[in-house]
């Protein structure tokens, strides 16, 4: 995913914290515009990864998530199977849920349906908004 424009007029590109960390550790960072681009796929294959990790990303083509021998897992901001797909935090707050969480699971053909590896729970207070729940999940997911 390309760096995001920030600032008053969006004229400055800022690397994500994940990219900054990877670069500080000398890890390769791939940022394709198209996930089916053959140059990107060749570069990804050349890494010979045993495992891939995806966080908060769009649907990956099977050729990408099926590449590592151990598979690819994802961190999703809900207690799957509840709130599969987009905006799970928003739906938990809109629906007045008292609890949400994060699920780590292996990617498969259908969105957010793979084998669950782990789930962590996070209470939602009556006064919590989407931003508070988001921040709580991000802190929990990073730990």
Where are the model-predicted features located?
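One-carbon transfer enzymes
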Residues: 1-143
